[in-house]
């Protein structure tokens, strides 16, 4: 009689974590950061049909990296939850914190109970009436949730991009300054330096000045005007060239 195969819970959790981290690392990066007028989303995304940045509700936005089908299902679920709560109670009762907690419970249950975890990392952002009330929540594949004070970086080159942001970020940046910083940081990821154009970027904001639905995409000429100049890109690239990481592009049809 053969003994049944046994895997310890610790080993099982390690293997699930490794699977999820590898899937996330294959995705192109996303930067979410606070600026003077609200919250800015900048994603490296050449696709014009598959969005990594989306609206959830009036003052709440969503960004994600990893396996598209999995984080898209989370986005749709979040929209439905927010709509039901806003309809049943009041639109002001729909908050980023409540939605982030719901996502954390869902991701944690999948990680511990299902055979395969979600290969995703997501950010839930909420713009407040003032800059002090803006909120950024980072959620990982296992349901861990962190309230970030300034910015969130997700994806395969997160360490390199975070280093660039840490050296240059300051509170109260204007939109053009924040967008230029985020785009330069994304360009610093990968092997050497790259120049990201309008066709490779997905940019949106939660604009505090808008009265109801604050989410607004920035495309075309408006986005082109936010791109950093050659001189700015060159100076930043020269500083970041020594610690550039690997740019893994395999599986980008499934990993975003």
Swiss-Prot record:
The formation of the proteasomal ATPase ARC-20S proteasome complex, likely via the docking of the C-termini of ARC into the intersubunit pockets in the alpha-rings, may trigger opening of the gate for substrate entry. Interconversion between the open-gate and close-gate conformations leads to a dynamic regulation of the 20S proteasome proteolysis activity. Residues 226-256 are annotated as: Disordered. GO terms for molecular function: threonine-type endopeptidase activity. GO terms for biological process: modification-dependent protein catabolic process; proteasomal protein catabolic process. SUPFAM superfamilies: N-terminal nucleophile aminohydrolases (Ntn hydrolases). Pathway: Protein degradation; proteasomal Pup-dependent pathway. Residues 245-256 have a biased composition (Basic and acidic residues). One of its GO terms (cellular component) is proteasome core complex, alpha-subunit complex. Keywords: Cytoplasm, Proteasome. Gene3D superfamilies: Glutamine Phosphoribosylpyrophosphate, subunit 1, domain 1. Pfam families: Proteasome. It is found in: Cytoplasm. Belongs to the peptidase T1A family. The 20S proteasome core is composed of 14 alpha and 14 beta subunits that assemble into four stacked heptameric rings, resulting in a barrel-shaped structure. The two inner rings, each composed of seven catalytic beta subunits, are sandwiched by two outer rings, each composed of seven alpha subunits. The catalytic chamber with the active sites is on the inside of the barrel. Has a gated structure, the ends of the cylinder being occluded by the N-termini of the alpha-subunits. Is capped by the proteasome-associated ATPase, ARC. Component of the proteasome core, a large protease complex with broad specificity involved in protein degradation. HAMAP family: Proteasome_A_B. This is Proteasome subunit alpha. The gene is prcA.
